């Protein structure tokens, strides 16, 4: 019964693995709900600041903030990539990496240089292996993103844009669709998207804010805060996506472990049955010989 003992050991090992994946699934489910609530709570602020920032940026044609001026000759771009710090979340990070690699190939083919800010340990490791020029990084964001942690790496990119070291800024993250679906998303942060002609016309005839002492410092501060809020929202969406993907991955692992245990038990029972049958046959044969 050496084979039977081996199979029992395998069954015990898979059962222990299943306990771990089941526990991780439950933890991820709890974190997912909190991350979704946090992400949804941040959306109204992001939408409101987007409206205010857009209004401020285009309401004063006499002052054009650098964030709204598109540059004709794009020689270098900045890329902020948001990923998870930990693995075991299915193909979440791999899907984001695929989008990044495809876009980087297009930029490189056009002779455009790339500076990278990596938020998340997985993205940092990937970009370093890729040989990318990582100018800033942030790891250990945790389950609750804090703006004071994000400001440092993001400001490095914003300063690079203001100083002309990069001509455009992009953000890559996993957008949360639902528990079963997360979509890798590449969005342009800078320069800000040009307004539609209808929106532009409405600004000229619509109300405006009263600025004290003047509009410039208000516009400068608001647009900076707007870009920071976009990055924060991207990180919040990515965390919700990560926990959802991890819960689904751990559930699949638990289900697979259950199937493997069933198959191993079947093999064990067949092996045991064959051993018993063999012993009985030997006993009968011995009795017949006597």
Curated annotation (Swiss-Prot):
- One Pfam family here: ATP-synt
Which superkingdom? Answer: Bacteria
- Alphabetically, which GO biological process terms does the record hold? proton motive force-driven plasma membrane ATP synthesis
Keyword field contains Ion transport: yes
The compartments listed are: Cell inner membrane
What are the entry keywords?
ATP synthesis, Cell inner membrane, Cell membrane, CF(1), Hydrogen ion transport, Ion transport, Membrane, Transport
The cysteines covalently paired via disulfide bonds are: none
Q: Which PROSITE patterns match?
A: ATPASE_GAMMA (PS00153)
The answer on whether this UniProt entry bears the keyword Transport reads yes
Provide the Gene Ontology terms for cellular component: plasma membrane; proton-transporting ATP synthase complex
Question: Any idea which GO molecular function terms this record carries?
Answer: ATP binding; proton-transporting ATP synthase activity, rotational mechanism
Topology relative to the membrane: Peripheral membrane protein
Q: What is its main location?
A: membrane
Q: According to its UniProt entry, what is the function of this protein?
A: Produces ATP from ADP in the presence of a proton gradient across the membrane. The gamma chain is believed to be important in regulating ATPase activity and the flow of protons through the CF(0) complex.
User: NCBIfam families in the record, alphabetically?
Assistant: ATPsyn_F1gamma, PRK05621.1-1
Task: Provide the assembly information.
Answer: F-type ATPases have 2 components, CF(1) - the catalytic core - and CF(0) - the membrane proton channel. CF(1) has five subunits: alpha(3), beta(3), gamma(1), delta(1), epsilon(1). CF(0) has three main subunits: a, b and c.
Q: Which family does it belong to?
A: Belongs to the ATPase gamma chain family.
What name is this protein filed under? Answer: ATP synthase gamma chain
């Amino acid at each position: 019964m050496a084979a039977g003992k081996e199979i029992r050991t395998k069954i015990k090992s898979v059962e222990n693995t299943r306990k771990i994946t089941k526990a991780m699934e439950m933890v991820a489910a709890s974190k997912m709900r909190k991350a979704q609530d946090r992400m949804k709570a941040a959306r109204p602020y992001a939408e409101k600041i987007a409206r205010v920032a857009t209004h401020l940026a285009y309401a004063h044609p006499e002052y054009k903030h650098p964030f709204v001026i598109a540059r004709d000759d794009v020689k270098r771009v900045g890329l902020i990539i948001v990923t998870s710090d930990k693995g075991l979340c299915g193909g979440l990070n791999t899907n984001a990496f695929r989008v990044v690699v495809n876009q980087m190939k297009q930029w490189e083919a056009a002779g455009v240089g790339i500076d990278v800010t990596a938020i998340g340990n997985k993205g940092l490791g990937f970009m370093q292996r890729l040989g990318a020029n990582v100018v800033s990084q942030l790891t250990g964001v945790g389950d609750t993103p804090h703006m004071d942690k994000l400001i440092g790496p993001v400001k490095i990119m914003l300063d690079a844009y203001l100083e002309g070291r990069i001509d455009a800024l992009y953000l890559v993250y996993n957008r949360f669709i639902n528990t079963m679906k997360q979509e890798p998303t590449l969005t342009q942060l800078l320069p800000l998207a040009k307004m539609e002609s209808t929106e532009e016309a409405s600004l000229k005839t619509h109300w405006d804010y009263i600025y004290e002492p003047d509009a410039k410092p208000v516009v400068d501060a608001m647009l900076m805060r707007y870009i920071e809020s976009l990055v924060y929202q991207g990180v919040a969406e990515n965390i919700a996506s990560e926990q959802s993907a991890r819960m689904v991955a751990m559930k699949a692992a638990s289900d697979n472990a259950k199937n493997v245990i069933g198959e191993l038990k079947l093999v064990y029972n067949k092996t045991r049955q064959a051993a018993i049958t063999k012993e009985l046959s030997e006993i009968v044969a011995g009795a017949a010989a006597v």
